[in-house]
């Protein structure tokens, strides 16, 4: 199996606190991988670093041998389900639903059709234009 995600010497700090001091790991293609640890140990921080939502203070992050440290988050092609409330309050419900598709360059008519499908599936089509 080839390595799909490789992290070498990752470091993350918040002020004077080092959350991730020096982490290296390889996750192979098709491998089932779990991050386990107590609250505040850096699990979500690491996932946010991989997705591009948090800065990387040290180390190198690779997807299939391609370094992604400086790759824009929209081009990383990673989905993330947030633990807490994570919508854009200035967007409508539909715009929030379409956000990921728009970042991936999906044409507007296709985004609209997909958002309609998802809104129907969730039975919230009546809320589509609400902010």
Predicted regions located by residue number:
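ABC nucleotide-binding domain "signature motif"
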Residues: 57-67
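Helix-to-loop junction immediately C-terminal to a conserved catalytic motif
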Residues: 51
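The feature captures the beta-strand-to-loop junction immediately N-terminal to the Walker
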Residues: 36-38
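Conserved ABC ATPase "signature" region
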Residues: 65-67, 102, 107-128
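Short coil-to-helix segment of the ABC ATPase nucleotide-binding domain corresponding to the Q-loop/switch region
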Residues: 91-99
């Amino acid at each position: 199996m080839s390595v799909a995600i490789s992290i070498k010497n990752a470091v993350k700090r918040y002020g004077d606190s080092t959350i991730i001091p020096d982490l290296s790991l390889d996750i192979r293609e098709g491998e089932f991988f779990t991050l386990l640890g107590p609250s505040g140990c850096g699990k979500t921080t690491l996932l946010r670093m991989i997705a591009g939502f948090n800065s990387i203070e040290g180390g190198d992050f690779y997807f299939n041998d391609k370094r992604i440290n400086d790759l824009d988050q929209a081009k990383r092609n990673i989905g993330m389900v947030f633990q807490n409330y994570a919508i854009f309050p200035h967007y409508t419900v539909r715009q929030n639903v379409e956000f990921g598709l728009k970042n991936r360059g999906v044409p507007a008519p296709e985004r609209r059709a997909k958002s309609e499908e998802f809104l129907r599936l969730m039975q919230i089509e009546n809320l589509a234009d609400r902010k």
